[in-house]
Amino acid sequence: MKRIFISILAALVSLGALLAQEATDQNPENTKFPFAIKAYPFRGMYLDKNTHFEKFGAIYPAGVHMGFEFPSTTQRPWQQYLGNPTVGLGVSWIDFGNPTYPDVAKLGMGVAVYPYILLDAIDTKYFQMRFKIAGGPGFVTEHWYTQEDQNPDNYYEPGVNTIFGCTLNAYLNAGINLNFPITRYLALGGEFGYIHMSNGRTCMPNIGINSLYGSVGVTATLNSDVEKKPVQFPDQPYGWAINITGAAGAHKSAIADKNRFLISSFHAGAVYHVTNWYGVGLGLDVFYNDAVTKFTDRSLYCKGEYDIDGVIVDCTTCGDSKDVDYTFAQKVRSGISLNNEFKFGVVTAIVDWGMYFYNPSRHIYLDYHKDNYGKVVPKRELAYVSPWGAGSEEAFHYIRLGAKCRVWDNLYAQMTMKCHLHIAEFIEFGLGYQIPFLKKANRSEGNGIVFHHRRNWWEE
């Protein structure tokens, strides 16, 4: 893992140098471009308080965050809209903590590589406070398939690692960054934040980690004396926009399953851009989940009772109910969502919250009266509450987190994770097309009402 970390760090240094050179090439009037290098050792604590972590005893994650940062010189519209944020390329090495007892599973180490952005909250000569948002791929050394005991019956045994299900995971990080300049070139700093790492049920198990952390470190800024004259950009020329997206992926339902199940979705929505960097609107979502099937050991998708020749059979595991079949309609769900978009140039962050209006699978779940086992609970309302608590079942509402990147004109590539409460259902990848409608003040004869993104649209 140390060799991997060093290799990734070397690649990151090279990439940072190339980006700095590209920025210089795009600004020929300056032969230099400011950038910074930082290192922040950190230590944290796990928020997860469940049987998967209790067996490890008192363990704490620790490691180091490193980054290569590029302060804004206001040469692009999105930088002006967001108050000149700092962007960076980061790499983190994490020791997840190893218990002292020899018969307890090992958590191992991890490495994450990610872009990040620092949004200014306070900016003075002697102190800066910024909000950090980061996300990218993370890699771990220890998971379910690196251990000898892979028997699902031993899932909760102390010697079994159930935190990660595969090497590749999604890494998310958010926090508050504090910076105290000492000289023009050197600053001391601290950072306090939250780390999440999991695979979004691409593999099982998918417990993942959730950790708070604190860190202190140092930042060295090169070419800090370079100053550029800010460019004044016009506002975004469009207000309303229609988004149409199709996406698909695959996920695992239970550890014992030998295959993954297809998932797919379709989204159509309208967003109004309240500001140059934020839009809000409503959307229609249709989801297909092939894991609603008899070919899984996950009892979450299982008909509670079924009648065979007049005999009521109690289904406790879907793998034993081969006579039960599921229709296409039971694999489909539809919902209406509140869509939020946060624009960072060609990249847009997505935060959606939706509620199902068509959700037949809510009648499938095993959910018996505590005092009258065997009697199925009556059909649920659309807005039902699980008596077993969060995570025991899926919810009547959903959250979708992700990002889309414009690749050409109004065409974009998208990656999103769909969750029920704090439990991930799947990660999907897709393509979409945005139709932005020009504001009346920006329309001209012969150009129509639809805006088309071009590299330097503000110069036209």
Predicted feature locations:
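Transmembrane beta-strands of outer-membrane beta-barrel pores
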Residues: P41-L47, F70, V91-G97, G135-H143, ...
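Outer-membrane beta-barrel "beta-signal"
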Residues: N210-K229, A424-E460
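Residues on the lipid-exposed face of transmembrane beta-strands in outer-membrane beta-barrel proteins
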Residues: A39, V64-S72, V113-A121, I133-P137, ...
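Repeated loop/turn-to-beta-strand initiation elements of outer-membrane beta-barrel proteins
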Residues: Q75-P77, F180-L188, S224-E227, N276-V280, ...
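Extracellular/periplasm-exposed beta-strand and loop segments of Gram-negative cell-envelope proteins
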Residues: G97-L107, T141-N151, E157-T167, C203-I207, ...
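Residues that define the transmembrane beta-barrel architecture of outer-membrane proteins
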Residues: F33, A58-V64, G83, A105-V113, ...
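Surface-exposed strand-loop-strand hairpins of Gram-negative outer-membrane beta-barrel proteins
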Residues: M45-G63, T100-L107, A250-G269
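Transmembrane beta-strands of outer-membrane beta-barrel proteins
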Residues: F35-A39, P85-L89, M129-G135, L188-G190, ...
